[in-house]
């Protein structure tokens, strides 16, 4: 059994990236970048375990893609790594950033082969440009540009990261502890993705698949007294409202389920559970806006939505255009890509008895095409 665990750091907010989509959720073929990098590593070496850090809200989504250990990331890279190290049981750990996807097998193998030589094995490259420090030109042959992955003694790394200082990588933390670091030559292809312009350097990545992803949503709410009726985010004049934990906007709820279904991200109850008082009586427009923000951050583009409201009463026709305008504002997609229909059940069933309203939705998504940047 291997004595080495792989830790991949992917909990960042991509604040410097300059796009709505997070770096770890750029799609390569039909895989998000974090999964592509994970599979690239696991194809190279039989790790004892793989631990991936993720933003807390995204952990349920990561778990739908793989069976690796997913842990909660933190505000800093260092704290995220400490969280991951709590799950590491092996004497050695290989740490890398998901934002450095073009990992070269020969570099990884060289790192692993040299693991007994120091507390940390570090790949580096030398700068090709002139280097100036404080207005003084220095010998660039004495300068090392540090890369990941880096292999460390697990116990020493844990100790190094708890010195009360913030470090930008494992090697600097271990050096500050007075432990030995061993450098090996890395590879210039192992670029780190920080800014959107860096995408042009990552020629190892396959462009996103042209796959269309389609999801369906269905929701039902019963009528109740003493509540206002909301559909598609607008108030509908009626003598009853709908019962529910939130404002019970049945149309928006069906649409959220369709969007999440297309992304493969579960359903509205997983994302906004009714056991959470945060969502008590909440305006469903806020839930839809958060869903749209999340889908964009995870690399999806909303291509089209189709929504059917099933109600005996009130009559929906007079409000359809206003509803479409509301959805246009919430989804932030062109007006003509939103289709809204209304029907009755001809007095059949609970809808026909005027006991409640149902809604059905279909959503089509595609992947954000970063190759066109």
Swiss-Prot record:
**Which segments carry the region annotation 2-C-methyl-D-erythritol 4-phosphate cytidylyltransferase?**
1-213
Which pathway does the UniProt entry assign to this protein? Isoprenoid biosynthesis; isopentenyl diphosphate biosynthesis via DXP pathway; isopentenyl diphosphate from 1-deoxy-D-xylulose 5-phosphate: step 2/6; Isoprenoid biosynthesis; isopentenyl diphosphate biosynthesis via DXP pathway; isopentenyl diphosphate from 1-deoxy-D-xylulose 5-phosphate: step 4/6
Task: Kindly list the residues the record flags as site (Transition state stabilizer).
Answer: 16, 23, 245, 344
Q: Which InterPro entries match?
A: IspD, IspD/F, IspD/TarI, MECDP_synthase, MECDP_synthase_CS, MECDP_synthase_sf, Nucleotide-diphossugar_trans
Positions marked as site (Positions MEP for the nucleophilic attack): 140, 192
Which keywords belong to this entry?
A: Isoprene biosynthesis, Lyase, Metal-binding, Multifunctional enzyme, Nucleotidyltransferase, Transferase
Q: Its family? A: In the N-terminal section; belongs to the IspD/TarI cytidylyltransferase family. IspD subfamily. In the C-terminal section; belongs to the IspF family.
Q: What does this protein do?
A: Bifunctional enzyme that catalyzes the formation of 4-diphosphocytidyl-2-C-methyl-D-erythritol from CTP and 2-C-methyl-D-erythritol 4-phosphate (MEP) (IspD), and catalyzes the conversion of 4-diphosphocytidyl-2-C-methyl-D-erythritol 2-phosphate (CDP-ME2P) to 2-C-methyl-D-erythritol 2,4-cyclodiphosphate (ME-CPP) with a corresponding release of cytidine 5-monophosphate (CMP) (IspF).
Instruction: Give the protein's recorded name.
Output: Bifunctional enzyme IspD/IspF
Q: Which gene encodes it?
A: ispDF
């Amino acid at each position: 059994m291997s004595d080495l665990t792989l830790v991949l750091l992917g909990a960042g907010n991509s604040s410097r990236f300059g796009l709505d989509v997070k770096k770890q959720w750029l799609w390569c073929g039909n895989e998000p970048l974090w999964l592509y990098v994970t599979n690239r590593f696991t194809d190279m070496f039989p790790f004892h375990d793989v631990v991936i850090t993720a933003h807390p809200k995204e952990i349920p989504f990561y778990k739908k893609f793989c069976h690796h250990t997913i842990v909660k990331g933190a505000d800093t890279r260092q704290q995220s790594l400490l969280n991951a190290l709590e799950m590491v049981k092996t004497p050695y750990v290989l740490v890398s950033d998901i934002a450095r996807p073009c990992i070269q097998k020969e570099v990884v193998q060289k790192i692993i082969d040299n693991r007994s030589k120091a507390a940390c094995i570090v790949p580096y490259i030398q700068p090709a440009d002139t280097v100036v420090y404080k207005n003084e030109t220095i010998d660039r042959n004495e300068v090392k540009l540090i890369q990941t992955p880096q292999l460390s003694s697990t116990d020493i790394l844990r100790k190094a990261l708890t010195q009360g200082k913030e470090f930008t990588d494992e090697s600097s933390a271990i050096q500050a502890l007075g432990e030995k670091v061993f450098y090996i030559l890395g590879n210039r292809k192992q670029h780190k993705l920080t800014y959107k312009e860096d995408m042009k350097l990552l020629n190892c990545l396959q462009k996103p698949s042209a796959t269309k992803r389609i999801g369906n949503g269905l929701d039902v709410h019963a009528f109740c007294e003493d509540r206002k009726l909301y559909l598609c985010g607008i108030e509908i004049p009626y003598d009853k409202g709908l019962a529910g934990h939130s404002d019970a906007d049945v149309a928006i709820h069906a649409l959220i389920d369709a969007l999440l279904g297309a992304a493969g991200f579960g359903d509205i109850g997983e994302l906004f559970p009714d056991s959470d008082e945060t969502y008590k009586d909440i305006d469903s427009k806020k839930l839809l806006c958060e869903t749209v923000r999340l889908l964009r951050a995870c690399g999806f583009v909303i291509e089209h939505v189709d929504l059917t409201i099933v109600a005996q009463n009130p009559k929906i026709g007079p409000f359809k255009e206003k509803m479409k305008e509301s959805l246009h504002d919430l989804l932030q997609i062109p007006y003509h890509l939103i289709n809204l229909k209304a029907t009755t059940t001809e007095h059949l069933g609970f809808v026909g008895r005027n006991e409640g309203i149902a809604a059905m939705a279909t959503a089509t998504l595609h992947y954000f095409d970063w190759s066109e940047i």
